[in-house]
């Protein structure tokens, strides 16, 4: 179990990877984001084919963050997101790699049993190009 006191600025955690099938993308889109470029593989469309909803990308990243990081830490939730960027489309049958970078570690002045970190969740394609980035605040218990 990791606590606030165990984190240092600059630490990076590998969260694992994911890949979506065309069926995954279309199924999510039908339910949550039914825009044409999430529903059909149209080479003449604005993205040159089928792409995942940015919200599906975020959901996949969140799942990796929870399974590989938050479930092994004294997480007390999140007060919010500072910055969110959808930089490149996520496509079917491509493996994407996620990581989490610690950017700030701040013990609470008012509640000494906890503190916050600012972390960056990143998703990269097979060429290591950044496709998704989220800077979020998280609260962690202290030892």
Give the label of every model feature segment.
Residues 1-9, 86, 90-95, 99-143:
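HotDog/MaoC-like acyl-thioester-processing domains
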Residues 1-80:
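Hot-dog-fold acyl-thioester-processing enzymes
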């Amino acid at each position: 179990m990791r606590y606030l006191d165990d984190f240092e600025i600059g630490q990076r955690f590998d969260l694992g990877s994911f890949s979506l099938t065309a069926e995954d993308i279309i199924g999510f889109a039908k339910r949550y984001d039914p825009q044409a470029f999430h529903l059909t593989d149209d080479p003449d469309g604005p993205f040159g084919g089928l792409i995942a909803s940015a919200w599906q990308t975020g959901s996949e990243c969140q799942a990796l963050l929870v399974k590989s990081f938050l479930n092994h830490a004294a997480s007390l939730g999140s007060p919010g997101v500072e910055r969110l960027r959808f930089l490149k489309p996520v496509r079917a049958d491509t493996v994407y790699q996620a990581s989490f970078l610690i950017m700030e570690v701040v013990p609470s002045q008012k509640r000494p049993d906890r503190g916050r970190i600012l972390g960056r969740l990143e998703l990269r394609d097979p060429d290591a190009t950044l496709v998704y980035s989220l800077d979020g605040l998280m609260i962690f218990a202290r030892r």
